[in-house]
């Protein structure tokens, strides 16, 4: 679908009588809010196909998207990179310090910024310089833990970050505007890793062109 389509009815209508029992809304931001809200309005969340409940899936949730979709989020499956309800020591420490400063639990985006800042600072320290190519080399193949989703790898070959994936479902009875997504399962990292060569491409040389 075109980015910023707004009206997704022409794409949702054919799904109604297609025989499909899953709709994956591979959208982000306002497009996800609009497409999900409209899919629910069309009755897909309550639909049954061949005796099975129809499922709407959002591949990657954010708090702002969940809040923007309102009640349409209830019961909807998806994934997220982190959730403030995690009980590992790193997550609890971050939630406590963030809450003390801002009066609310951190979002997934806040967690990402926090983790990336720590990783960059650590890479600069290991490299002994801010020179980008040397910092990059420190991050390539770097393993770390303690940030919420278990052992994590920055793969050297394509710079992709791999960790356990949280499967979430929109909370039917949220206790607050921050309790919209409930973790229902965790997919192990090994199940989402893939062969880096399938997409081809080159990362480029370790040099900065002036």
Model-derived segments and spans:
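Extracellular/periplasmic Venus flytrap/periplasmic-binding protein
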Residues: 1-42, 84-93
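Active-site-proximal beta-strand/loop segments in catalytic clefts of secreted hydrolases
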Residues: 1-2, 25-29, 58-62, 79-82, ...
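Venus flytrap/periplasmic-binding-protein-like
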Residues: 3-4, 45-71, 136-144
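Periplasmic-binding protein-like
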Residues: 19-29, 35, 48-59, 109-110
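Extracellular/periplasmic ligand-binding modules, especially the Venus flytrap/periplasmic-binding
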Residues: 29-32, 84-142
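Rossmann-fold dehydrogenase core element
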Residues: 71-81
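Solvent-exposed, acidic/polar segments of extracytosolic/periplasmic ligand-binding ectodomains
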Residues: 143-210
């Amino acid at each position: 679908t075109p980015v910023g389509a707004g009206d997704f009815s022409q794409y949702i209508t054919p799904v109604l009588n297609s025989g499909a029992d899953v709709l994956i809304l591979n959208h982000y931001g306002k497009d996800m809010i609009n497409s999900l809200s409209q899919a629910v309005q069309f009755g897909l969340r309550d639909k049954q196909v061949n005796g099975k409940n129809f499922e709407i899936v959002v591949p990657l949730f954010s708090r702002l998207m969940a809040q923007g979709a309102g009640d349409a989020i209830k019961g909807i499956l998806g994934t997220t990179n982190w959730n403030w309800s995690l009980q590992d020591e790193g997550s609890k420490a971050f939630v406590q310090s963030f809450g003390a400063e801002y009066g609310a639990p951190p979002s997934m985006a806040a967690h990402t910024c926090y983790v990336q800042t720590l990783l960059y600072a650590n890479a600069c320290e290991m490299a002994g310089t801010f020179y980008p190519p040397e910092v990059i080399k420190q991050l390539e193949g770097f393993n770390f833990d303690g940030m919420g989703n278990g052992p994590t790898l920055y793969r050297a070959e394509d710079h992709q970050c791999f960790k356990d994936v949280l499967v979430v479902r929109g909370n039917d009875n949220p206790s607050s505007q921050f309790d919209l997504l409930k973790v229902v399962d965790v997919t192990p990292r090994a199940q989402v890793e893939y062969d880096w060569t399938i997409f081809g491409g080159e990362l480029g040389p370790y040099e900065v062109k002036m």
